[in-house]
Amino acid sequence: MAIIEVYQRLEQPGAVAIDRKADASPLTEADLAAHRIIVDGLRALTPEWPVLSEEDADVPLAVRSGWSRFWLVDPLDGTKEFLSRNGEFTVNIALVENHRPIIGVVHVPVTGIDYFSIASVGAWKAQSADDSGSPIRVAPRSNIPLRVVGSRSHASARLTDALHALGSHELVSMGSSLKFCVLAEGAADVYPRMGPTSEWDTAAAHAIVQGAGGDVVRLDGAPLEYNRGSGWLNPDFIAVGPRDHDWVRLFSGVS
C-alpha cells in the first residue's frame, strides 16, 4: 500500500517530502497518494455520490448543502503519529447520509486491522484482508476505575480539568481514530474530546462506535452531526461506550 511504502522510507532522513498546510499541520506524500487512490476508487464505485476528502475539502456550503449522501474521507488520520513512526495512524472512510455516518471503515496500515460498521446492523474487527471480521461491542458496564482514552498529540488544559472532575480513572493516550475503535471493542469506557477535530477525523469511527452499541454526542447531549456548517470543525464531544453513567452530566462543568 502507498502509505506503508512511504512509512518505511521515513527511516531514511530526508527521503520523504513534508509540507505544511494552512493550519501548520503536516502533509506528506502518503496523504496525497492515499487520497488519490481512495477518491478514484469511490468515484468509480458510486459515481452518483459526491466524495469529499481532507485533501480536497474546498467545497462551498451552497454546493454541499444539497448532498443527502456523500463519502467523507481522511486518507491519513494521525500524520504526526505517522511521522513519529509509532503505528497509531489510520485511513478513515465514512458514508454520511442526512448528516449522520451510516457506514464506517477504519484501516490500520501497520497492523492490517480493519474496523467496519453498518448503521443498525453492527460493527466488526478484521485482523487481515483475508478475515471476514468478528463482531465487536462496547463494554456492557464501566470499569472501576474508569478507562478513559485521550489524544496523544492534542492534550489540553480543558481535558485535564474534565478528567480531574471524573475522579479515579485510568488514562490511555493514543493517536488518530484508534481512540474510537478501542472504545468500540470494549477496551475503554469513554473518549472525551475537548479540542479541535475535523469531521473527516471522526465520521468513520463515529459510525463504528454506534454500530458497536455506543454513541458520540456533543457536550450538550445533542448528536454529533456532519455537513451542517460552512466549516468542517467539530464541536467538543464525548464518545461513550457503556450507558451506566450520565456522561453528559459528568462533563457538564467543562467550559
Residue spans of the language-model regions?
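Buried hydrophobic positions in well-ordered alpha/beta secondary-structure cores of metabolic enzymes
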Residues: I3, G78-T79, V148, L183
